[in-house]
């Protein structure tokens, strides 16, 4: 029997919605990264985008364990000499774009390359409960019910 290799035309992509209220960031990100790549499917093919389209709502209400909310630092560089900047996870979550914490966690679990960029395009993260993807009829995925460690009382 020959090894199965999925063709891009054969892939059917599902729409999945996840409510991130009270979920632990790292555990949510690993599950989302796996589904974006399609590794949860028996038809997974490494060089084909066979993952799902994922919508994450309430990303502002995620939880970091331990002291990471205060101590975890996100760095970026302006491009100028001495232009390295840092922000804590707390300042990002309380700031203008709290969904960036979840986006960065997932992005750093996806391979860096052309296919990884396409797969990251299948992720939509919203800080609040509203999203513009009702027409796609996403099916809800209850991450908190999968494992008791996925959820923390905030």
Swiss-Prot record:
Keywords, in A-Z order: Ribonucleoprotein, Ribosomal protein
Keyword set includes Protease: no
Alphabetized InterPro entries for the sequence: Ribosomal_uL13, Ribosomal_uL13_bac-type, Ribosomal_uL13_sf
Gene Ontology CC terms, in alphabetical order: cytosolic large ribosomal subunit
CDD domains for this protein: Ribosomal_L13
Membrane-spanning ranges: none
Disulfide partners: none
Keyword Disulfide bond: no
GO molecular function: mRNA binding; structural constituent of ribosome
Subunit structure: Part of the 50S ribosomal subunit.
Protein task: This protein is one of the early assembly proteins of the 50S ribosomal subunit, although it is not seen to bind rRNA by itself. It is important during the early stages of 50S assembly.
NCBIfam families: rplM_bact
PANTHER family assigned: LARGE RIBOSOMAL SUBUNIT PROTEIN UL13M, RIBOSOMAL PROTEIN L13
Family per record: Belongs to the universal ribosomal protein uL13 family.
Protein name, per record: Large ribosomal subunit protein uL13
Organism the protein comes from: Rhodopseudomonas palustris (strain BisB5)
Gene: rplM
